UniProtKB/Swiss-Prot annotation:
Main localization, broad class: plastid
Lineage: Eukaryota, Rhodophyta, Bangiophyceae, Bangiales, Bangiaceae
Family: Belongs to the bacterial ribosomal protein bS16 family.
Protein name according to UniProt: Small ribosomal subunit protein bS16c
Positions of transmembrane segments: none
Coiled-coil ranges (or none): none
């Protein structure tokens, strides 16, 4: 199953994450199928390729809870309860 999740990179105590599509059985920092965006929790900076994310979601990719929250904040996907 393909999941949209975060892949950590950056220095110690200064994490940055790439939003990637990868197999759910892969390691957190393993090989990604496709890079879809960027998230920095320290500066709260987010860059997202909306077209690629929507394409992956239409193909049946699942999101992790954190990525879903990031996409909700960016108003890319609607909240389920709304």
């Amino acid at each position: 199953m393909v999941k949209l999740r975060l892949k950590r990179y950056g220095r110690k105590q200064q994490p940055s994450y790439r939003i990637v599509a990868m197999d759910s059985r892969s390691k957190r920092d393993g090989k990604a199928i496709e890079e879809l965006g960027f998230y920095n929790p320290i500066t709260n900076e987010t860059r997202i390729d909306i077209a690629k994310i929507l394409k992956r979601l239409k193909q049946g990719a699942q999101t992790t809870r954190t990525v879903k929250n990031i996409l909700n904040e960016a108003q890319i996907i609607a909240k389920e309860n709304s």
